[in-house]
Amino acid sequence: MIRLSEICKEEWNLLRDGEFAGLGLCTAKAGLPLLTFCGNPKFLRMALKNPDVACLMVPFDLAQQAAEADPLRGVCAVPNLRVDFFELHNRLCGPEWAERYAGTDEPTVIDPSAHIDPRTVIAPSNVSIGANTVVEAGAVIYGRTKIGADCIIRSGSVLGGSGLEFMRIGSEGILGVEHRGSLMIGNRVEIQYNCNVSRSLFPWHETRIGDDTKIESLVHIAHGSHIGKRVLIAASACICGSAEIGDDVWIGPNSTVSSEVKVGNNARVTLGAVAAADVPASSTVTGNFAVDHELFMLDHLRKMRGE
């Protein structure tokens, strides 16, 4: 556990001390005490409803309201909310705090029955590869990646690297945010050529690919996404950050599932579709932006007829 008083900077205002084990967004379900940030009363209310939130980082004009809202939560006011929050995350990922915040490194473990091409690059720590898994030449596997049994990782794929998380800090440039989460790949998963699957951002969180899922070449899966079991993802699809794909889903070629969108079990996202809203279970969506497939086709036929 880390106390707010341990990490407060001189220009911050600590209204009430508190303890946290991780950082996260205000609605995160982490199963551990979190420090989150709230930029306005709406997000403050959301954070107060989340039992995992133990400490609050807020702007100065929200400090008193946050302190009075719950006497059991720690509160710290800061001048540059989002930047201060993610700079703190980066600081906690550094050598002084990493063991308390992100855990200790463990040696990489590869099952003796796995078939690893010698031209593969595998991090020396925090990687686990299961029985009978095949990793082809040119694949790169970063730390904090666990691959189950009987998987196939084809040439050129990059697993467990950092994702897109940057903060603009005005004239000072752009702040890159450390990725200290993990990537968990189930059993009998195949990831074909030149795919990218990023690990998650926060240490307690993971990007996840379920058992028996098959991913064709040139697919991008962003940080924090959860892919279910027996999912088929065709070439050049893009799964954006924190998307949730259910079981037995079809994701068509060149399609996009937007950030935080949920695709229900047995749903289909067709060729080139852009799913910017949740996709109900057992439905099929088409188009940009994606709508119900039958409605899309009816509209298309009307246009062809000049109606």
Write out the residue ranges for each language-model feature:
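Terminal amphipathic alpha-helical/low-complexity segments used for targeting or macromolecular assembly
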Residues: 1-107, 112-113, 150, 156-157, ...
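Structural signal for interior beta-strand "rungs" in well-ordered beta-sheet cores
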Residues: 37, 103-292
